[in-house]
């Protein structure tokens, strides 16, 4: 009896896979799933897992995997179709009879599937040493070429002759999406002079092809047209291979191209699929979420990749919840996933996965990074855009979390910057004309020594001041002289003025010691100032400035060549955010201290 493919989905939805499995396996509940001894290989420790929510089984030992129908097929030895009939009978699920129209549709589908299998055999037979060499130069091994059934469609009429010899007509080839017709009526092979890559559905049936041009020519990549067996909005390249790994890891990685998938699978990342050069659809997302809770988008690091990310974000926001997640791998500009793993290695790509960013963080980076928010209108527009994203989230709890996240980001990145201006009259460094921020900080450290020499009693502070490398050499000489007098010669702070007057450092001493000098705010000169807060603020501001300068240096032109560079960039980003947050807390503490003591 022929079943409609849609009926398979009915069975998956109607029958709990755990109910079927436990007839053959003793299952134990664990973390929302079930575990037991695998029925397909000998083992002493349970490695066989079953998930009703994912409607899937997977063995970590022998890698057996599939849905409830596949399990029945593996246990009984029946075909997939016959296993579905058995399940329907056992569980009282009515099997709908096919209408005449449906019978004709599925007969046509079977015919097309058979033709596509024949086409793939032909394409594989046409691989030449030149084509194999081209693929090998792209780091695709002969084993991978065989695994993915990569072939070649030659020029000329060999393709048409192959099928005509089998009594397959041009009409049939056209329905299978293998030939086209020119304006003059001439029939031509759609993939002529292209490397062919078969596209398989979830059942491992070839439903179409992708073609990659050899040499120059446009389009570089070409997909089969949509047919009764191939709809781009439903199909993901590599899905038949990825589903087991996605279930095991609880995430899928979504890329753009065939060779991205092939290279990543070859490198061991078998949870990768591609969207066949078309926009991601809701069907794609739901299909991937059935295999794992998280979808990781890894798109090219160019403007087109960013635009594709924005489209996917807007599509996904109404669908996400605590169990359906989207995250992103940000590739350096000019790098695609294929390059990332072939040029930089497996460890580099693993690190990219481990350091992926959340959907909320991706939205923030898209809306904030590289833009100026000098006016109230700029900031209002940012807030409006972020609220628009949040409003699309259906899950109320998640929507509230996104609001809080964006509010925190605005506070950390915009409000605290405004506080630099507001707090100039309270506790921040004056923005003195003619001095860089680094020079202001260096002068502030020396001014602090003159005003509060007792800080040198703290060992860590004394060591920091002693080892500080000044950009201003005159200031460094003054530091050395001052510390020598205070520490080595035990000169009292009150006696320094008389001594320095006889040296070449008198002018700089006067500049640094005046109560309203350029380098310490008047708030610092109060008798009841909190020295601990003051020192921490200056030290962290100096540290942050050096972090920012080093980060700007290593990210120049956004070129990341190896995993060490990537880890270094990641460290600086995290450390900068951490210190900036600590400075914000110190700002507030200092302001509160000043206010309390002014009452």
From Swiss-Prot:
Gene3D superfamilies: 3.40.1360.10, DNA primase, catalytic core, N-terminal domain (3.90.980.10), Zinc finger, CHC2-type domain (3.90.580.10)
Cofactor, how bound (note): Binds 1 zinc ion per monomer. Binds two Mg(2+) per subunit.
Top-rank taxon, per record: Bacteria
Binding positions (Mg(2+) 2): 300, 302
Entry's EC annotation: 2.7.7.101
GO biological process: DNA replication, synthesis of primer
Catalyzed reactions per annotation: ssDNA + n NTP = ssDNA/pppN(pN)n-1 hybrid + (n-1) diphosphate
Zinc finger intervals, CHC2-type: 38-62
Gene Ontology MF term list: DNA binding; DNA-directed RNA polymerase activity; zinc ion binding
Family statement drawn from the similarity comment of this UniProt entry: Belongs to the DnaG primase family.
Subunit structure: Monomer. Interacts with DnaB.
Comment on protein domains: Contains an N-terminal zinc-binding domain, a central core domain that contains the primase activity, and a C-terminal DnaB-binding domain.
Role description: RNA polymerase that catalyzes the synthesis of short RNA molecules used as primers for DNA polymerase during DNA replication.
HAMAP family: DNA_primase_DnaG
Protein name per Swiss-Prot or TrEMBL: DNA primase
């Amino acid at each position: 009896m022929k079943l409609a493919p849609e009926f398979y989905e009915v069975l998956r939805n109607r029958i709990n896979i755990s109910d079927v499995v436990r007839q053959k396996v003793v299952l134990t509940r664990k973390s929302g799933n079930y575990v037991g001894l695998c029925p397909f290989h000998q083992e002493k420790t349970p490695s066989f897992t079953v998930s009703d929510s994912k409607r899937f089984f997977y063995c970590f030992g022998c890698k057996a995997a599939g849905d409830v129908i596949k399990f029945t097929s593996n246990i009984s030895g029946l075909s997939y179709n016959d296993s579905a009939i058995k399940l329907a009978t056992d569980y009282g699920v009515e099997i709908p009879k096919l209408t005449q129209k449906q019978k004709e549709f599925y007969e046509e589908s079977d015919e097309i599937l058979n033709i596509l299998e024949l086409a793939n055999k032909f394409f594989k037979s046409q691989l030449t040493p030149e084509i194999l060499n081209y693929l090998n130069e792209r780091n695709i091994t002969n084993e991978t070429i065989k695994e993915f059934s990569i072939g070649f469609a030659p020029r000329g009429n060999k393709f048409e002759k192959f099928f005509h010899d089998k009594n397959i007509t041009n009409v049939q080839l056209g329905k299978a999406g293998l030939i086209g017709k020119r304006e003059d009526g001439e029939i031509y092979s759609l993939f002529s002079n292209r490397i062919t890559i078969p596209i398989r559905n979830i059942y491992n049936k070839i439903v179409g092809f992708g073609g990659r041009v050899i040499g120059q020519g446009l389009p570089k990549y070409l997909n089969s047209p949509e047919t009764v067996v191939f709809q781009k909005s439903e199909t993901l390249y590599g899905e038949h291979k990825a589903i087991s790994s996605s279930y095991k890891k609880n995430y899928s990685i979504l890329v753009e191209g065939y060779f991205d998938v092939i290279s990543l699978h070859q490198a061991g990342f078998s949870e990768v699929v591609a969207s066949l050069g078309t926009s991601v659809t809701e069907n794609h997302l739901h299909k991937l979420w059935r295999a794992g809770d998280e979808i990781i988008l890894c798109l090219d690091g160019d403007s087109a990749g960013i635009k594709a990310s924005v489209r996917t974000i807007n599509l996904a926001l109404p669908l996400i919840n605590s169990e359906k997640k989207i995250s992103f791998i940000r590739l350096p500009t000019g790098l695609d996933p294929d390059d990332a793993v072939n040029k930089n290695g497996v460890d580099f790509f693993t690190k990219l996965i481990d350091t992926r960013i959340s959907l909320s963080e991706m939205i923030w980076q898209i809306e904030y990074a590289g833009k100026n928010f000098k006016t109230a209108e700029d900031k209002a527009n940012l807030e409006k855009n972020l609220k628009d994203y949040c409003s699309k989230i259906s899950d109320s709890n998640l929507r509230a979390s996104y609001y809080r996240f964006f509010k925190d980001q605005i506070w950390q990145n915009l409000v605290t910057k405004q506080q630099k201006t507001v707090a100039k009259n309270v506790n921040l460094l004056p923005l003195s004309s003619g001095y860089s921020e680094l020079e202001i900080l260096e002068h502030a450290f020396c001014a602090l020594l003159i005003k509060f020499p007792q800080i040198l009693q703290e060992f860590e502070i004394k060591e920091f001041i002693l080892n500080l490398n000044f950009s201003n050499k005159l200031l460094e000489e003054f530091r050395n002289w001052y510390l020598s007098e205070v520490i080595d010669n035990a000169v009292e702070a009150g006696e320094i003025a008389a001594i320095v007057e006889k040296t070449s450092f008198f002018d700089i001493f006067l500049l640094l010691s005046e109560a309203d000098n350029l380098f310490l705010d008047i708030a610092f000169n109060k008798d009841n100032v909190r020295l601990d807060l003051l020192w921490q603020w200056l030290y962290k501001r100096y540290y942050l400035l050096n972090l920012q300068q080093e980060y700007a240096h290593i990210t120049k032109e956004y070129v990341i060549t190896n995993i060490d560079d990537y880890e270094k960039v990641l460290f600086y980003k995290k450390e900068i955010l951490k210190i900036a947050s600590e400075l914000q807390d110190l700002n507030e503490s200092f302001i509160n201290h000043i206010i309390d003591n002014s009452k």
